[in-house]
Structures are given as structure tokens and as C-alpha cells.
């Protein structure tokens, strides 16, 4: 067990000031706290607490640190620093020691520390998580929960020896253990819907509490007399229950943690942002505390911003899904919204398919004479085959839904592909027969065939437990004859880099699978069924993406926007010359647009009839309407700045939405999007296609894959397990022109510090899912009011959606942005279905997406919507307090996890319904995100020098927020679109015969052995 010094504990936390303690609180020097000083925080969101055995002190967690405060209240003393990331303290029986969970090294482990914060010692190690520790009454044992057994179970640790014993071992998720007063029993939650009690002597378990339907249970705790207390949450209600009696007040926001008992008739628990003493006869007293939390203003660094006026020719780096021909002489890929064919040795590629639709994922037939690919030219993504010599096209599928990511079998008789639900199908080209190869998978990778055509392999996620969704991206093999599924880690506790184009890919001779792990290429020897026959071997040590075999013994890959090849022995790496360039498209003309009214994005009221004078795609002047005829007569409309959705993921379902997506955003007046995470080469390709004018859609700022920790969930998150790998991720970001960097849920604080420093040196802002210590280490923003968190709950909103002083004050004081992504805004469809029924929505939504949207709107008519609206009101209240306090709120939706385009308007309407003025709401979707992007004055406003990104609407959006969606015309960079023009490609479709037009229904039988198999759309937040 490694002991860490107190200086280690507090280093970097802004709480070590020459070891000086002032008024019982850890002091913070001006140099350490920065110019912002310290905020005196007296409320905490989702804090947990534990009373010392003598009843004199309370230990609690706040801003992911452990603090103590006298039971009478007063100044809180901080015991741990930022990098320890410690929560959920529990006292030893002698009152000298605390145990807590801490995320110091990328997994949750148990630590002890003395009551003064010294003597920090790590008790558990390894790749599994260890959480929720509680000392036994005799102090000899610590009970905790862990996923070390394949699901969450209750374990005990012998304090003297460190030996760990599993106490429960079932498929259920067992957590939050609590000791009986005599130390002979443990109570714990089961799947959050029940509480069981284990007799440690006999091993017998008994069910003591079962939650009502729709309720969850948290934090069991035994009273001195053995009565069980716990927290019950149902809908918009959270209650503290003792025995069979609710002891909390109506409307109280009880946090989901175990109470501590002061006596048989009094306990301490956390609720409403406070530490509360509560007697069972109903008396409540707040234990007031003041915690000095360091606050720093956002770092002042030189921002890298896009030159929105540039017409300079640029090298294409957005080379999406490259694949080599069987003879190794050609490469097919997508770039600039077209499919291309490169003959190796001739750097100038030939453009194959460029009809304006979304054409993607080419693959060669075995003879190399044709490619198959996916295209939405007939409405949805279908499979097509193109003869490379003649250009003749053949439609292979005309099925409902999307058919994407095709891969031909080695003999050319079959195609494996993925549908919109994550099911892999096999199409027999001779008969047209379709066979379902896999159940529904969560965002799987592109399949690859064994040489004998009997097995498929692909990347798929396997979580560590049901309780927390993260896991590793593994090699999934599918025996096509038996349907047997087999998961194999590429290396112990490692992930395939992304579940897209990073493998696995089978070598032509069947000897190897190749894949990318930690941004480098590896090969592993396999048998005919894809079973590993030896350890994986590293092939490259530079940034490596998008693997394809180039003949039998070489690999094709992308290195920071350059095609390269290398031998499987790691030798002979060299560039494959490719000459492909583009110029940003710019409007070159002068226009005068006359409007009936104008909101300039700044003033709180409309201007009257105005002329917007445009020159070369920018606003030259805004003048009172003149007498000369305008170029564009929009006198029946109101002009406003184009809206900005600051949290989207273009390519989370990009293959399914295809060309519809950009058109939909424009049709709803959204002229700029920001993505905090997308598959990097899909992002780069779409960004360049939009800039070049080869694709229709809004501006696209963003980043590649988010930098994650040791575990992942989404297919576009990168596991990062070493500093060396972190440097590779940052090198990719610099080379491929990211606009920002997002760090994701499992990245530890020490790594996050490194990313912040490197990103700011490169001029890039950052965002994450965390407020603290992100605020203190220089992060620029936070996504969501409180979504997926490695804790399993948020420290910015409670389970009832409420935020307290810690969250609001730190946002206001620090200047960090918050992007709310109000998923509960679907509640507004209880009295307003105009967005659902709008022609733009009905035309541009894929049919299956529209059906889900209608179902969501229908749910707003049910009694359950009362809970949705209560949570929504709480979320908006938080955001409004931040906004009116001077904080930095930028609108974003998490589309397509929430519905593209329409969800931004639903968010705006929800803000207004629960307290924002229309002006305030619109500011969060125009001027504010423009400032975050570094384009204040260029985007989000109508003023001289701004880009001509304009939306022309019917009505007054400052009086009726619904008018912001009543778009008739939209302009991006001076290029004018009518709504009819945007809808036209998907309003009607030519009838094109297809090889197969009917498919058997997919079987979604849920196999408990693979409980995590589910469609991506079943999860509605990026969290």
C-alpha cells in the first residue's frame, strides 16, 4: 500500500499555502487560487456525508474533494486535492481515519487518510473500479462495491492484510453496502430496485425492501436499533425512508446517499444542498458550512480561429474510410462529398461518384473491377454497385431503413452491412436472400470477412457492468453457420481505438487480424475462426487510423491526413502520394436584402424596415430601408442572425441521416454547428465538403474523437491509458485542424491537466462533462447540465434536476461555459406539436427517426409528462440563474441523440416557458456561442463585418419564440436558400429498381448472456 504525502494530496488543488490553516479551513494563496480568489460555498449538489463516531464532525464531499466541518457548523477544512478526485467518505470507528473512493489513476480505488488529511494510502489497485467504502463497526474490515467479479458485487477488504473477499456473486448489480450495528450483516442495493441483507456468518440473503414500479433505491443505512433507512426516488420525488415511514418533507430534494446516525432518534443526511440533522419526530437543523473553493478566470491564451474569409487553396485531409483494392494497386475513399479512386503511383485521384448525395464506405469486389458503397440518392442509405470501367450503376438494396458500411465476402458472392439499429446483415447477391448475422449491437464497427467466408469479425463494445455503461471495444466474431458470438479483448483491458475504420480487418491469407489500439497499428495471429493464437504485435508507433490491408503483408493507414503504408513487420513505412486540394467557396457579389424588421443579435428589440447591404458574403452595412429596389425583397419577413447549435454529433448517425442532415439544420435557420466529438476523418471530410461548397449545410466547427480514459462507450471515444498515447492524440488534433478538444468521462484529472496545457498552447479551447476541478485547471466549458459522469451521478444537478450554490456560483465566477442540452424539452410537446407536424420535419427526417420523434411527442400527452416538465423546469432554473448571474450559457442539443434542428427550437421554447425572455434565450443560441468559437462579431450578429449568416422568419421572435422556427429563407455566407430548395432532393424520388426490396423483420430477442446488446437510439444522451 503506497502512502502519499499531504503535499501530494493537496498539490494542484489550490489549497496548500505553506501548510497554513486559517480559521480551521485549508488556506488558499492568491497565487494558487488565481485572480479569481476563492468562492465561499455553503451549498453542495449531490454531496454525501458521514458523521464522526463521537458526533463532533461531519466529513463530506464537495467539488470532488473530502472536507470536514464541526457538527455545529463553521468553516470547512479541505483534506484532499484536485488530482485525487475523492468522494463518499466514511469514518473509522475510532474517528482517526477516513476511507473514500478516489479516481486518481483512471479507476476508482479505495484510499484511507487521517482525519486531518495526512497519510493518504491506497488500498486497492488494478483495472477494476472499487466504490462506496464503509468501515465495519470494529474497524477491521471495509465493505465496498466493485465490478471486479463481472458485475457489481459487494466485497470486503481486511484492513490489516489487504485481502479482499467477495461477499455477493450474482448477475445483479449489488452496491452501496452498509453494516449492521453488530457487524454481522450487510445491507446493499440490488439493481437499484431492491435492498437485500446478507448474513456474513451463514451467507444467507433476504430481500427486505422492494421498490415500487418506477422507483429507485439508494443509500441503505442501519439505525442503532437495526431499523433500515434508505432513499427512494420516483419521478420528480426523492424521499428519505426509515423503516416503513417517509421522514423527509414533501418536495425535499433528498440526495441518494446513506444517512449517518447520531442516535436512535436522530440522523444526518444530505438534501436541498445542505447537511441536515433530522430527528425522527420531524425537527430539522442545517449544519451550515463555508467551503473556500478556488476560482480562476478562464485562461488568457492566443486562440486559434478559422479564417472565415479565406479562399486559399488547401490540402484535403478529410480522407474517409479508405480501402485498398485486392491487388493492392488502388485505393477508394470519400472526400469532398464524393467517392474517389487513387491508383498508387499516380497522385491525382479520379472522382467516381459526385451527385450531391451522401455516398460513403466503398469496398472493392474481389476482381477489383467494381465497388459497392452506400448512397442516399433514392431517399435513404441503400447499397449500390459501380463498374469502375463503364460507370454503370446497379442498385442492390431498396429496403426500409439504412444499409451502410458494406463489406464484400472474399468470393464476391455476399455483402455484410449494418442497418440503422446496429444489426449486421448478410446479402446473397445471387438470390437476394438476406440473413440476420447479429442481434442489435450498440454502434458496432464495420465488419470484415474470414477468407473462407464463414466468419465475420467487427468491433463491438462490452461493458464491465450493467450499472455503468462504459467498457472496452473488443473484437466480436460471428460464426455465420451457428450464430455463435465471441468477444475477445485486443489486449487485456484495452480497446480497439474506435469502432469505425480502426479494425479489425482480416488479412487476405487469414493469418492475422489488424486493428488500431491506442492510436497505433497492431496485428494478432488468428485461426480460421478468428480466435487469437498468440499475442498482438505492434506495427506502428505513430498516429495510425483507418486500417486496410494492402496485399498480404502490408497495411494501408492514415497518419494525420496522409495516406501511408507499412509492412506488417513494422518496416518500410512510407507516404502514398495523393494530390487533392480544394478552395473554400465564397460568394462574390453585392446584394441588398430588404426586410420588414430586423433583430441584430444584440439589441433587446427589433429594428423596423431595414436594408442589409452585403458584399462578398459579409454584412457591409445595416441601413433604414431605401427607395431603390433591393436584390432580395423580404419585406414580409424578419431577419435575424442564423442560429448556432453548439452541441451536435454530425456523424453519430451520419451514415443514416446522410445529405438530409445539413439541409434540415439550414431549413430551421441553423447556420452554424459545433461538435464536441465525431469520428475524426468523417468530421474532417464533412468540414471540408461544406467549406468547398460540395455539400449543403451549416458551418461545422468541432473536434475528432473525445479523449477518454481507460473505458469507453460510444464508438467515437478514444481510450487513453498512457502519457505517450496522450501525446499522439494531441498530435492528431493539431495536424487535422481541430477547433476544440473534448475530454470525456473517464479521463483522470492528471491527464486532463496535460490536455488543457497542450490544447491552450495550440490555441484550442476545451470542454468536458465536469465543472470541478475542470474550472480550477483551466477548462473552457462544460457540456450538459449534468449528464454521464464517472461517479454515476452529477455534482452539478441532483436526481431531481436541481442545482445548488456550488454549481451556479462556480459557473458564474469562473466564466466557464455551460451547454445545457435540455433533453427534457420534449415535455413542451404537451401543448405545441408544430415542430413535429412541420413539412420540413416530415420531409427531411428519415422515416424511422420521424416515427421515434412522433412517439416522443405523443408521450408528452401522458401523465408521465408531469415528471418531465418538473425536471425540465429545474434544469431551466439552473441555467437561468447562471445566465442572469453573468455566466456563460451557450445553446446546444446533443443532436442526433436529441432530434436534429427541431430540438434546438424545443430548447429555446422550454427556456422561455420556464423563465427566460425570448431575447435571453436567443442570445444563448447566437451571440454567446459565437464568442465561444472565437468569432464574436463575425457570427451570431447582424452588423458590419459579420458573415452573412441570416435567417428570415415570419413574425417577431423577440415576442414569440416560436417565430424563430418560422424560417422562409436562410443565408449562409451570403448564399441564399429557400426552404423548398432545401427539401427538394428528398421531397420526391425517382423509382430505381433494386436487387432486393423486402427483408425479414430483424429479431431483437434479448439474450441475457449479452445484456448490453441494444440499438444506439435507446440511449438518449451523450451524457
What residues fall within each predicted segment?
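Short coil/turn segments that connect the beta-strands within blades of beta-propeller domains
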Residues: 54-56, 94-96, 138-140, 182-184, ...
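Short loop/turn segments that connect beta-strands within beta-propeller blades
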Residues: 70-74, 114-118, 158-162, 200-203, ...
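N-terminal export signals
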Residues: 2, 8-29
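A flexible loop/linker signature enriched in serine peptidases of the S9 family
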Residues: 42, 57-67, 82-86, 99-111, ...
